A protein has these predicted regions:
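PDZ-domain C-terminal substructure recognizer with occasional recognition of PDZ-binding tails
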Residues: 162, 291-298, 337-342, 348-354, ...
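PDZ/PDZ-like domain segments forming the peptide/carboxylate-binding groove
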Residues: 242-243, 251-252, 307-349, 354-356
Length: 391
């Protein structure tokens, strides 16, 4: 997909990288950003600078941008006052029960070399058992750069692992071990998640011996766009304040029922104190990508064939609100052209899921694969069907 972004108008803080193998190192400073410009479309940075929390040295994140309207402050109007609704108390999750259910599904992934039959570890991360056949999900950045891998189960058993395949675009990978009595994790869904929903991270931080660790928090944001490297941007990420540290990459983020809602992938570490922010790849993307890797050794990705930007509508109080993706270009021979999508159209939904911004369109397309057929809703009321190309 062709994507266009405006340059960032705001300065961003400097972040530090952190991995289980490299400790703490200062990040390169984020370059100053140009001043805010008012020229019809306004832009602010979207993604935090983050670090991957596993093998291979921290990658310094930089800003990705998408267009946003100005923040407008006005005096309160009596007719628009909204009365806060009382919040009923809810039962806290039974974290002991969640731990008992999830920990057997979490493994430590050690990556290194084995030149003379002796395994030499160079870094470590976490993994999640997907099935009884021994397929294990982890992050691509955990396994890249190594020539050998082994897996340590929660009960201490150690197995050599084969790399089935990787997908750098989503930073996912699949390892496989031949072992009995595995405990596959139960997959959940992110569809019903709201900010404040309990979230529990289970992984192998710092490569510590003794089995996985559990930390508790909430889902603190949804649909984050996160850049973890020069060419790696992750979309639709879950944000959590459940502590995620070095070595936790590839571990699980689960809900109060112990069901997988994401694979922990990155953590924000800032020199100005912006900490306690972790990011997880949503389970829907994990399920699609790992299933394809298990079946074919690689994952496909959908290509619609448009270039565009977030479109904004003026609203009655003088502000503006995102309302879809304004199509700026349509590639010849693309799935978009075949569906009759034209420059000037505004995409508002994919398969019934609302799309208000460019990053939401990318997230929706990453949930499906190349060759899949989708329905695309347009602002003028049309709903078109097209088969997505593969890249």
């Amino acid at each position: 997909m062709i994507m266009t972004y405006a340059p960032p108008p705001l300065n961003r803080p400097t972040y530090s990288t952190l991995t289980s193998s490299s400790g703490i190192r200062p990040a390169a400073p984020t370059p100053p950003a140009p001043q805010r410009r008012r020229k019809g479309w306004l832009a602010i940075p979207v993604a935090l600078a983050v670090v991957v929390a596993g093998f291979g040295g921290g990658l310094i994140g930089s800003s990705m941008q998408q267009e946003r309207p100005p923040v407008i402050i006005e005096q309160a109007r009596p007719e628009r006052v909204v009365t806060a609704q009382p919040v009923s108390a809810t039962v806290a999750p039974d974290t002991a029960a969640v731990g008992a259910a999830v920990i057997p599904s979490i493994v430590t992934v050690e990556v290194g070399t084995e030149p003379n039959g002796t395994f030499t570890i160079s870094g470590s991360g976490s993994g999640v058992v997907l099935d009884a056949a021994g397929n294990i999900a982890t992050n691509n950045h955990v396994v890249e750069g190594g020539t050998a891998a082994r897996v340590i189960l929660s009960d201490g058993r150690i197995y050599e692992a084969d790399l089935i395949g990787t997908d750098p675009l989503t930073d996912l990978a699949v390892l496989k071990v031949s072992a009995d009595d595995l405990a596959p994790i139960t997959l959940g869904s992110t569809d019903g998640l709201t900010i404040g929903t309990p979230a529990i991270a289970v992984g192998s931080p710092l490569g510590l011996e003794g089995g996985p660790s559990l930390s508790v928090g909430v889902v603190s944001a949804l649909g984050r766009e996160v850049q973890t490297g020069p060419e790696t941007v992750l979309y639709g990420m879950l944000q959590t304040d459940a502590p995620i540290t070095s070595g936790s990459s590839g571990g699980s983020l689960v809900d109060a029922d112990g069901k997988l809602i994401g694979i922990t992938t990155a953590v924000g570490v800032s020199s100005i104190g912006v900490e306690g922010i972790g990011f997880a790849t949503p389970v829907e993307i994990v399920k699609r990508v790992t299933s394809e890797i298990i079946a074919t050794g690689s994952a496909s990705h959908a290509l619609l064939g448009i270039g565009g930007d977030t479109a904004y509508d003026q609203i009655t109080d003088g502000g503006s609100a995102p309302m879809g993706v304004d199509v700026r270009t349509v590639s010849a021979g693309s799935a978009a052209e075949a569906a009759g999508i034209q420059v000037g159209d505004v995409i508002t939904a994919v398969d019934g899921t609302a799309v208000r911004a460019m990053d939401e369109l990318i997230t929706a397309l990453r949930r499906v694969g190349g060759g899949d057929t989708v329905e695309i809703s347009l602002r003028d009321g049309r709903v078109v069907t097209t088969t997505l190309a593969t890249r």
